[in-house]
Each structure stands twice: as structure tokens, then as C-alpha cells.
Amino acid sequence: VQEPDAALAELDRAMLLRSVQRLVAEPTLRLSINVCRTTLHDPEWPVLLQDLVDRHPSAFARAVFEVTEWPIRAAHKPLKAALAPLAGLGLGWWLDDFGAGLTSFNETFIPSVTGLKVDRSLLRRCYADADQFGALKLVTSFARRQGKTCVIEGVESAKERDFAEACGASHVQGFFSGVV
């Protein structure tokens, strides 16, 4: 029986290799590649990434990695320690589902973190009450001051897009924008 972390790392490796194939085959394509926090602690991961970046630097110039919050047991494994050996590769690392779970504001200060993907649940909550407490504006302003990309997920209408942009999102993602 394979350990859950090993199975996730195997899936992440397969998705990474498939993503690189697509990036090489389609020179104008830009991709976000999800990776589990536990995979980042796999000792083989930095070696694989280094090899792929060395062989396909232009492909990685058009890719970013979205660090997922799952699995929950990854909470005790510091993200900063996992990203440290990867810092020299010049890759973009975004915190996925920001505002929904275990990602903390402290992780936004990690030098390798270049973007936040604000979870759709925060958009829904703030849109429902017109962001009366300023939570969404706080997150987008915080990201902007740090020079980070801020994508708001779950945008499903023109009104939600306008709201997300008014709150300071640098990008939106969702069924409305055609990006899922």
C-alpha cells in the first residue's frame, strides 16, 4: 500500500511532466501548476525541478506553481523550509486558496512566494456583504504592497468581476472569465 504523501508526490510529478510537455509544445501557453505542500518536502522534488528548468528554461518562464493547502497534515511542515532549496530556480510560487484554511499571512513574506490566489469562499462572503469589513480590499492591498500577483477565484458574473476589480484584484479566475 502506497503512503498518501507518496501517492500525491507521484501525481504532482506526473502533472508537472505533462505540463512541461504542453509548455514546450505550445510556446505561447501560460500555465499554473498545482503542487501539494507535502510534495515540496519530497527530497526528489528539487532535483526534478532543477533538471527540468535547466532543460526547458523558456517553458518555466511561462509557468507558476500553486501551492495547495491540502493535505491538512502538511500544516506542520514549514513552507519556507520547503521553498528554500528551490529559490535559485527563479520560479513563481502562489499560495492557493488563500483565506480559506491554513495559509497564513506569514507565508506571504516568504521571498519565493510571488502571488496569492484568494479562495472563492472569501469572494462570496465579501460580495454578499459588499465587503463591509474590508477583508478583500485588505488582502489585495497587502499583496499589491508586497509586489505580488493577487488572483481572486470563483468569479462567475460581470458583477463579481467588477467587485473583485474594485477591491483591487490584479486578476480574476472563474467560469465568467472562461478560466477554470
Task: Map each language-model feature to its residues.
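EAL-family c-di-GMP phosphodiesterase catalytic domain
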Residues: 36-41, 66-75, 91-180
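Catalytic core of bacterial c-di-GMP phosphodiesterases, primarily the EAL and HD-GYP domains
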Residues: 6-79, 154
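A general structural detector for well-ordered alpha-helical segments in enzyme core domains, enriched
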Residues: 15, 19-22, 45-52, 78-86, ...
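A short, polar/charged loop-to-alpha-helix boundary motif
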Residues: 1-2
